[in-house]
Amino acid sequence: MYPYSDADAFRRQPERAKSSQLRTSAVDTRSAFARDRARVLHSAALRRLADKTQVVGPNDGDTPRTRLTHSLEVAQIARGIGAGLDLDPDLCDLAGLCHDIGHPPYGHNGENALNEVAAACGGFEGNAQTLRILTRLEPKIVSDEGESFGLNLSRAALDAACKYPWAKTNADGSVNKKYSAYDEDAEILAWIRQGHEDLRPPIEAQVMDFSDDIAYSVHDVEDGIVSGRIDLKVLWDLVELAALADKGAAAFGGSPAELIEGAASLRELPVVAAAADFDFSLRSYAALKAMTSELVGRYVGSTIESTKKTHAGIDVGRMHGDLIIPETAASEVKLLKTLAVLYVMDDPGHLARQNRQRDRIFRVFDYLVLGAPGSLDPMYRQWFIEADSESEQIRVIVDQIASMTESRLERLARNAADISGFLG
């Protein structure tokens, strides 16, 4: 395994030894990263992902994937890639578990709505909210002075969770669209990034990112097929495929030719051809599961092999080495991701559903602002009262909304509408 250092396992806030161990208890022999993973696994923030949208909402269909089930799948894939590359598997696993922990209700639609209402405090970004939850909002470690350190994860764990390891605003004043830290959290990010000589994410974060792409593309396509939104026969319809490739390249980058090549290589796989005949029978469900299993193994195995070949003789870990994704795997994953996203987006009810979701977020924001601090939960109420500016107060309100489940947000939106109607 890669030789992780004491600095990698260092935590921002020193912790006292546990005092409640039974005298007969065995000494805790877990590594720092195993403890980190346990903290994420037992966090309320992770549990709340069970009631947050993945591609379709948690209440659409009998067994749709949620942000939580998606995160568990990402963690399992990341753990496998990490083990294959001799990285710490717990470190890769926890990066997968918490990669979406900052996502608000309604996924990217909710993220865009919150970014609008958060303009006065610098905007909203799901990846930056992940860091904020891990280092501030999730209650675990609090200093004697009352400062929250969130889960107080190790440096390497936080680094593995940072997909875009830079703050919103650059030194020259330019602004990044994607980032892993709000400007007010830049000091925390600087502590995390000690030892890095460039802006590349550590290889554990690269593993998490590609594992997310694998899970998103393969498993969410499975959900789309079962829900009737996706038909794999499009891979053989060259006219529709060309239009889809154009949309996918515009949405995710690359060229249409790359996506068409991905479709061509997928057509050659017997498991894909078998799954394309999905008819809701027992045999077709089994064929679909066979396809998802084989595709995940295909992308994991080829990426491990390519990375090992490129870095032969080198200890890969942290800021040493990059994940090498074969071109065929990359093009297939991008094509499947296009299928998963665009067919849902083209659903006639999708735009109307998104508008309703945005309206709920705006309504709850207004309700909390007008009633603050009394309208806030006790923990957020305390932060609101202690805030030094209106901008900081808005950030606290946005933090609370982002942490809500969709069910709770919808209940609060109904209450806000009832109060608004009563007041005229």
UniProtKB/Swiss-Prot annotation:
SUPFAM superfamilies: HD-domain/PDEase-like. Belongs to the dGTPase family. Type 2 subfamily. Keywords: Hydrolase. The keyword Metal-binding does not apply. It comes from the Bacteria. One of its GO terms (biological process) is dGTP catabolic process. This is Deoxyguanosinetriphosphate triphosphohydrolase-like protein. SMART domains: HDc. The keyword Chloroplast does not apply. Residues 1-27 are annotated as: Disordered. GO terms for molecular function: dGTPase activity. Residues 67-217 form the HD domain. CDD domains: HDc (cd00077). HAMAP family: dGTPase_type2. Residues 8-18 have a biased composition (Basic and acidic residues).
